[in-house]
Amino acid sequence: MATTKTGSLTIAGSGIASVAHITLEVLSYLQEADKIYYAIVDPVTEAFIQDKSKGRCFDLRVYYDKDKMRSETYVQMSEVMLRDVRSGYNVLAIFYGHPGVFVCPTHRAISIARSEGYTAKMLPGVSAEDYMFSDIGFDPAVPGCMTQEATSLLIYNKQLDPSVHNIIWQVGSVGVDNMVFDNKQFHLLVDHLERDFGSIHKVIHYVGAIMPQSATVMDEYTISDLRKEDVVKKFTTTSTLYIPPREIAPVDQRIMQALEFSGNGDRYMALSQLRGVHARNSGLCAYGPAEQAAVDKLDHHTPPDDYEVLRASPAIRRFTEDLALKPDLRSRYKEDPLSVLDAIPGLTSQEKFALSFDKPGPVYKVMRATPAAIAAGQEHSLDEIAGSADSESPGALATTIVVIVHI
């Protein structure tokens, strides 16, 4: 539905680590919003939000209550934000972690706002899962990863795959539909884990550090340990459970042949091992023959002839940074690029022309050049810049990253 009304809704994530995970993008919206709602867990972030905002702030946690169904709370959280949107305000709501991961009122509010003709969007934040990838040290792509919510896992009797990483969220609120977290049903989750992994398989109880004074929790237990009363007490609403792979999935030789991977897929396996070399207790060799050969070439490396470096005036550097961080400027630019650009001093004619398209291709084209072209004073022609308007590619680096991820 086309947006026709003046109010807007932006949902953002504060990340996990207090203040440190708030992105520059979120900060820019915080400084420009008319009304700010938040549902976060630590007072430092709350103080930061209040100090950096210009609009009225409201704590959504006030709608939680031990005697209320959480579903009722989530509807109320959504509705109070929507009321201000309907009144024509630009509303920002900041939620702990990633605002779209295991969060109900955010998706509800965005869906309703859009259905009523308002502009609504979500800005990402660091989730517990992102934090876990860094702290525990594993790549979800190798050999794959499944993410489940604890209660949903049990209700739908989902089978966990022992050949991939398994992440189970909200293990400290199994079967809870209010705000009473007593771990009474935790044993049902342990039953399920024993069925799929056995009692001696090791798992990690994970809680990412929130406050500057906090310490990250990465406690390792066997699944049978999870039945011990003193262990169960350690699981809270911020707990996540990581279950490492128990076995290696068999290779499908028919597909290997179709992909033209030789033998047992050595080329793919080498890449997979390189991705997973930092995983805990992986046992992988960081400097095998292939890795060492790559290292040996470093001292003799020369950039290819088509390698491009940054070539940008101070004006385009400032403007593109402001465009990324200032929502109001971005809105005005998208409505009428030329009128905004006319007010920016210092842009070269090529830079202004490239920016006038409001397309990424011309900007990439004009802000990079080979060292040889720079030394010779060569500039891209206007036709070359215009010809890149249909390109979304940021160049070889991003293309290479995509190929590596999907190989």
Curated annotation (Swiss-Prot):
- This entry's Enzyme Commission designation comes to 2.1.1.-
Q: Where are the transmembrane segments?
A: none
Q: Which residues form the active site?
A: R70, Y74, Y96
Which parts of the sequence carry N-methylisoleucine?
I401, I404
Record-level GO BP terms: methylation
| PTM (free text) | CeuMA2 automethylates at Thr-399, Thr-400, Ile-401, Val-402, Val-403, Ile-404, Val-405 and His-406 before being processed by a prolyloligopeptidase which likely forms a peptidyl ester upon removal of the follower propeptide, which then undergoes macrocyclization with the N-terminus of the modified core peptide. Peptide backbone alpha-N-methylations change the physicochemical properties of amide bonds to provide structural constraints and other favorable characteristics including biological membrane permeability to peptides.
An example of a GO molecular function for this protein is:
methyltransferase activity
Residues that bear N-methylhistidine: H406
What ranges does the record give for the region Precursor leader, renumbered to this chain?
A: 371-393
PTM N-methylvaline: list the residues.
V402, V403, V405
Binding positions (S-adenosyl-L-methionine): Y96, H98, V101, A128, Q170, G208, S239, T240
* This protein's UniProt keywords: Methylation, Methyltransferase, S-adenosyl-L-methionine, Transferase
Q: What class of enzyme is it?
A: transferase
Please give the residue ranges the record annotates as the region Clasp domain. 247-370
Q: Residue positions of the PTM N-methylthreonine?
A: T399, T400
Q: Which InterPro entries match?
A: 4pyrrol_Mease, 4pyrrol_Methylase_sf, 4pyrrole_Mease_sub1
What pathway does this protein act in? Secondary metabolite biosynthesis
Q: What is known of its domains?
A: Within the homodimer, the clasp domain wraps around the adjacent subunit to position the core peptide into the other subunit's active site for iterative intermolecular methylation.
Sequence similarity? In the N-terminal section; belongs to the precorrin methyltransferase family.
The protein's role, per its UniProt record: Fusion protein of the methyltransferase ceuM2 and a type I borosin core peptide; part of the gene cluster that mediates the biosynthesis of a type I borosin, a highly methylated cyclic peptide with potent biological activities. Type I borosins derive from the C-terminus of the fusion protein, and it is the same protein that methylates its own C-terminus using S-adenosyl methionine (SAM). The C-terminus is subsequently cleaved off and macrocyclized by a prolyloligopeptidase to give the final product.
Subunit relationships: Homodimer.
Q: What is this protein called?
A: Methyltransferase/ribosomally synthesized type I borosin cyclic peptide precursor ceuMA2
- Read off the lineage from the record: Eukaryota, Fungi, Dikarya, Basidiomycota, Agaricomycotina
